[in-house]
């Protein structure tokens, strides 16, 4: 599995759980820190998509994966399907 994709998904799930979890002092700061970390991976992943539409399809799949509606392996298949050039 692509390590960038794996780390991105781990951080995304962690942030999603944090957002939906109980409130605590410093939660907003922790969420912002997670967003900053995710953004680094997101920029690297975005470079592989040839269109904004393809990236949007991928982003929708990330959300599905974070909520358990799609496996990480399925997400990886979507990612490679959208980023692999056709010859």
Swiss-Prot record:
One Pfam annotation reads YnfE
Keyword match Phosphoprotein = yes
InterPro entries the record matches:
YnfE-like
Q: Which residues carry this modification: Phosphotyrosine?
A: 12
Name the source's superkingdom: Bacteria
Q: Which UniProt keywords apply?
A: Phosphoprotein
Q: What is this protein called?
A: Uncharacterized protein YnfE
Q: What is the originating organism of this protein? A: Bacillus subtilis (strain 168)
Q: Which gene encodes it?
A: ynfE
């Amino acid at each position: 599995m692509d390590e960038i994709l794996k780390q991105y998904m781990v951080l995304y799930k962690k942030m999603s759980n944090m957002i939906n979890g109980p409130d605590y002092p410093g939660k907003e700061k922790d969420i912002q820190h997670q967003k900053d970390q995710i953004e680094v991976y997101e920029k690297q992943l975005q470079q592989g998509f040839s269109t904004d539409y393809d990236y949007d399809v991928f982003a929708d799949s990330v959300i599905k994966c974070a909520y358990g509606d799609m496996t990480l392996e399925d997400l990886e298949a979507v990612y490679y399907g959208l980023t692999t050039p056709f010859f």
